[in-house]
Amino acid sequence: MHGRYFPELMVTRAEKFIKQNRKHPFLLYVGFNIPHYPEQPLPEHAKLYEGMEEPRKLYASFITTTDYYVGRVMAQLEKYGLTEDTIVLFLSDNGHSVENYVIEKDNHSSGYPKGYDYGSNGGGGNTGKWIGNKGTFLEGGIRTPAILSWPGRVAKGETRGAVVSALDWLPTLCELAGVAQPDAKLDGHSILPIIDSSDAVSKHKALYFQWQEKWAVREADWKLIYMPDDGGKLSLHNLGDEKPEVHDYVSEKPEVVTRLKGLYDTWAADVFAPRP
């Protein structure tokens, strides 16, 4: 029995939604499962990169497939004359993946023995000078695209250098839609001033990251990262370095470590429920 390609199902439904709701304001969230592994591009896109070496070959093919489906959503907006006054956001949740998995038990359902290496579930990404990847708090793992299309208000090709977070989009969209924000405390800020002007600055005095026991806090160009391995380790980096996050300043800047650790402790006490 052949399965059905999930991106095709999702975009077909998105196209239908746009058609059905084209005559009044709408919010559409299209949560693509691509280019997340398993990397399964459309055959016609895989053929475009036959002369390229792996893992770049497979990743390039898959990115082209992603681009194709994003293009279909955009084409549907254009078809019904909605492009000019529709805000389109393209976001990602983490950097490129270099994960691989090994079977850790006997009698695995796949039939393969314990210790069998499935191989890489990704690869091929490139983050330039920013080292790191998915699963790390290095910039290569958390600095992700934020692409906005809004022809009626934002000119093509403009860029912004201010730091923003995915947390900022809810208050931003609430402001644009004239909707009252939730009564609950929000960590995000409206970035409408940044959208409108390249001179606007970020309202974030610090950014916080946490995954299980790992955490990081960033203030301006300083970033403190805690890894629980080997009894716990702190590393301090300056994002303004020529080679960011390569040099560790922990021993050189103890006062910065103390200040950033204090910021994290205050944030964690506010966010996390007390442990029993």
Which residues does each PLM region occupy?
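Short, solvent-exposed turn/loop segments enriched in Gly/Ser/Thr/Pro and often Arg
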Residues: Y29-Q40, F90-V98, D187-G188, F209-Q212, ...
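Histidine-centered active-site microenvironments of extracellular/periplasmic hydrolases
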Residues: P38-P41, E78-G152
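The substrate-binding groove and active-site-proximal loops of carbohydrate-active enzymes
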Residues: M1-E8, G51-T65
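Beta-strand elements within well-structured catalytic alpha/beta cores of enzymes
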Residues: F26-G31, I63, V70, L77, ...
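Active-site His/acidic residue clusters
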Residues: T12-Y59, S97-E104
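Non-transmembrane alpha-helical segments in soluble domains
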Residues: V11, E15-K19, A60, D67-V70, ...
